[in-house]
Amino acid sequence: MTCLAWNTTPTLTDLCRAIEQHTAPLYLIVCLPENHIPDFSLSNQPSELEGRLNNRLVQAIKCLQFNNVNVLENLLPDVHLWLVPPHRTDRLHEHFPHIEWQTKAIPQSTPTPLKPWFRRPEHQAAPEHVLIIGAGIAGAATARKLAEHGVRVTVLEAGKTAQAGSGNRQGLLYAKISPHNTEQTELLLTGYGYTRRLLEDLLPDSDAWGDDGVLHVNFDDSERKRNQALGLQHQHKHLYRSVSAEEAAHIAGIDVFSDGLYWPQGVWLNPPAVVHALLNHPLIELHEHSPLTAVSHNGTQWTAHTPNAHFNASHIVYCMGAHSPTAADTNVSALPFRQIRGQTGVVSASPFSQKLRCAISGESYISPSWQCSHCYGATFVLNSNDETWYPHEEADNRAALHQLNPPLAQSLFSDGLQTPPLQSTQGHAALRCDSLDHLPVVGALGDIAAMQSAYAKLALDKNYRLDNITCPYLPNAYINTAHGTRGLATAPICAAAIAAEILGLPHPISQRLRTALHPNRAIIRAIIRQQPLLSV
C-alpha cells in the first residue's frame, strides 16, 4: 500500500506519472487549496491513461463535500483518489499510517489522545473468513467491501434478503442535514457522495435508480429556516441550492406550491436491487432463512449456530438492523437501541403523476413513476416492533401525500382518497433500528461485562483517569447497525469504515466520527450514569 500526497491540485499528467511509477494498491491524496471542485487539467496531448482517468473524474467529483475527506475508490483498478478540504489537510494522520509527499509537506497537527475505549483493538488478526449477520444494506455493503479486498465472506440472513428496512420499493438517497457542522451532518454529507459514486460503479446501466434529483419543499417555518441557512453555504451549491416555487415547479414538472432546497444529484432507488447487486460477488456466500440462534468463540474462531447448520470464521460483523435488540450475543442485544416502525404505499401512476420528474420530500415523500407505479410515505412509529401492514397507516400516508401535493394525490386517489381501496394497496411495513443519540453504531465490539468491571470507577467520577487500562474488546467482532431512516446514505460509508478497521486500510471517516459512532460510547455512558447495561 502506497500513499502519495500533494499540497495542491496536481495535473492529470502528474497523477498519471505517479500511477505509472508505483505499484497498486495506490492512494493518491490531494490536499485542496480551497473549498471548490478542483480542476484536473488535461495536457494538450493527453495519453490514453490520462483520458481514462479524466473520464472517471468528470462524474466522480460531482458530489464532493467540504466537511471532510472525499473517498473516490477505484478510479482505476486499485487506484484510489482522496480529496481533502483545506481545514482537514493537517489531520491526515487520522486516515493514513504513512504518507510520501510529492510536494512540500503540510505540517500535521498533534493527534489528540484517545480514551482507551475508543482506541483500536490491539493485536488484531488478519481476516481469513468473515461472518456477516444480516443481509440488508449494511450487511451487503460490509460484505462487498471485504470481498473486494479478497476476503471470503459468509452472510447469514434470518429471512429473505433486503426484506426489512431495505425492502421498500423506492427509497431516497439524500442528506437531510443541519446547517451546522454536527457529527450527523458530517456523516450524512460524507456518506451521500460515497453512496452516489457507489451507484455509478455498481449499477451503471440499471433502471433501478433515477438521478433527477430530490426536492425538499419548505413545508413549515422551521424547515424554511433550515433550508435557507443551507442555501447560503455557497461551498456546497453544487450539492444543494435554494429554489423558488417557480423554479421548483420547473424542476419537478408539476406545481409544488412552495420554495425549497434542491439536491440535483439526489436519487430515488430500489433498495433490494442495490442489496442484491452488492452481494453478487464470487467471494460472498449467502444463506437466507438462517437466523442466528447462538454464537461462541473458542479462542481462535467464531462459530455461528443456526437451526440447520453452524458456520466458522475468524471474524464476525453484526449488521442486524431492527433485529439487533434480539441478537444472540448479549454484547449486541444489551446496547440501547430504539425500533421505529415505518410503512410505505405503492400506487399505479396516473397521466398527471407521470409528469413528476424528481422525488419530492416534505413531511412525507413521493418518488417519480418507476415501472408505472409510485412509492410514497412513510409513517414513523417510535418503539414499535410490529411489522404488520395496516390500512389505517395507508390512510395516513395518503393524507400526508395530499398535504404534500393535493393535485398529485387527487390524480392518484379518488372518493376522498379511498380509491383504490386501502386494503388493496401494495406497500411495505418494516422496522428500522436507531440509537438513542440518532447516530449509527459502528466499530469494534467491547466485552460489556469486562468493561463494566474495568471502568467501574467512572460511576464515581466520570473524569477518573483510566488511560492505562486497555479496553477489553471481544476478539475480532464488529458491528454496523442503527442507521435509522438514513441507511442508504450512511451504511455504505460505515461499511468501508468497518473494512478499514479489520484490514488496516486508510480510514474513510474522521476520528471525530469514529468516536461518535463507536459502540463503546453507550457502554461508558451507562457506567457513568450508574445504569449498567448488563447485570453482573
Residue ranges and their predicted role:
Residues 261-307, 311-315, 319-326:
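Helical element adjacent to the flavin cofactor pocket in flavoenzyme catalytic cores
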Residues 179-180, 205-216, 242-280, 379-382, ...:
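Helix-loop-beta segment of a Rossmann-like dinucleotide-binding subdomain
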Residues 171-251, 423:
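Dinucleotide-binding Rossmann-like beta1-alpha1 core, especially the glycine-rich loop
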Residues 2-109:
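The AdoMet/dcAdoMet-binding core of the Class I SAM-like
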Residues 141, 186, 307-399, 407-426:
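Flavin-dependent oxidoreductases
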Residues 4, 122-138, 154:
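Beta1/beta-strand and adjacent pyrophosphate-binding region of the FAD-binding site
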Residues 148-167:
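Glycine-rich FAD pyrophosphate-binding loop
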Residues 414-536:
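C-terminal catalytic lobe of FAD-dependent flavoproteins
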